[in-house]
Amino acid sequence: MIKEKRLRIAMVAGELSGDLLGAGVIRELKQHLTNVEFMGVGGPQMLKEGFHSLIDISELSVMGISDVLRRYPQLYLIRERLLREWTINPPDVFIGIDYPDFNLSVEARLKKQHIKTIHLVSPKVWAWRQKRVHLIKKAVDLVLTLFPFEEAFYLQHGVSAQFIGHPLADLIEINPSCSALRKKYNYHSDDTILAVLPGSRVGEIKYMGPLFLEVMQRIAMERPHVHFIVPIACQDLYPVFFKQLHAEYDYLKIQVIQGNAREAMAISDVVLTKSGTATLEAMLLKRPMVVAFKWGILTHAIIAPQVKVPYIALPNLLAGKKLIPEFVQEKANVDSITESVLNLLDSSNQNELIKQFTDIHRTLRQNANEKAALAILRILEDSLT
C-alpha cells in the first residue's frame, strides 16, 4: 500500500506565502503517509514540518521584471542544481508551490522524465499572459487552484484542475472576534486604527512605502485621532522602511511591528494595503480596505498591455464586481488613496460589504489542506500502481 511505501516528495516554494501553503500540505500528508521524505526549497514553516531545503528560500526572492533579469544567472544555476539532484534521485512527485515562472520550467523538465508534477496555486493566466495555459497543460499533471474561477478557466482549456479552497479561509473564523487583541497593542476599544501594509519584500516597500507614508501624513493632518499600525514582514525589511520613515515622516505616531500582519488588520477599522494575499486576509477578517499597487516602469510597460481582468484586488475579482476601491500605477496617488481611506474611516455602516465578504469566505472555506493532500495521494497512487 502507498501508506507504507518509501516516498520522496519534491517541492519548491519561492516565497514566504508559498512556504505557509507548503507547510499545511506537508502536515496533512504526514497524516496519511508513514514513510515519506520532503525536500526541495522551502521556508521556516516547511522546515518546522521536517522539510529538507536544498536552497535557502531567500535566494529565490525577486520582484518585477528588472529584478528577474538581474538575478537570472543565479536563478538558472539554482534550477539546474535542483534538476540534477532530481534526475539522479527522482522524486515520486514534484509539487511547485506558486512561483510560476521558475516552477513551470522545472515541472516541464521533470514531466519529460515521467515524474508526476502538480502545481499548487494557479499562475494568474486568467489575468495576463493567457497563452501560458498551453505550457501549463504540457508541464503539469494537475493544477490545484485556490479560487473557483481558476478551476473553470483551466477546465475550459483542457487542463486537469481542482479547486481546493484557500487555507486562510479555513484558518480565519467566519465571524472573527478581535476586540481582545487591541489590548495587546495598547489600544482602547474606541480608538480609530488604520493598518497600513506596504508589502513583504524590499521591492514592494521601495515603491509603496513612500506613497503610504505620505497618505498617513495627510490623514494625520485631517484626522489627528487616527492611530497607525504598520506590520513589517521580517527584520531584514526594517532598515528599508525606517529609512523612508526617518527621511521625512519621523514625527508621525506610527506603531511598527514585526510580522503579525493579520493581527494588525484584525484590530484595525480600515486597512490600506498593496495588492496581494493581504487583500484576501483583510476580506476574511471582514475589514474595509483600500488597495493600491505600483510597478517599476519596465515591469508596467511589459505587463499592463497583457492584463485581461478589470480588477487587481482579490475581493473584487472574487465578487466579479468592485467591492473595494483599488488604485494602480498612476492612479495610485496620494489624493485618491487618502480620499478613499477617509471615506471608509468616516463610514458608520459597512454591513452590506461585510455580508458580501462573508459569502465569499464561505465559498473559499473548503478544508484546503486536506483536499490538496488527497489530490496528491491520488496522483501518487495512479503513478505507483
Swiss-Prot record:
Pathways involved: Bacterial outer membrane biogenesis; LPS lipid A biosynthesis
- The name this protein goes by in its record: Lipid-A-disaccharide synthase 2
**GO terms for CC?**
membrane
Q: What is its EC number?
A: 2.4.1.182
Explain the purpose of this protein: Condensation of UDP-2,3-diacylglucosamine and 2,3-diacylglucosamine-1-phosphate to form lipid A disaccharide, a precursor of lipid A, a phosphorylated glycolipid that anchors the lipopolysaccharide to the outer membrane of the cell.
Q: Is this entry keyworded GTP-binding?
A: no
* Any one of the GO BP annotations: lipid A biosynthetic process
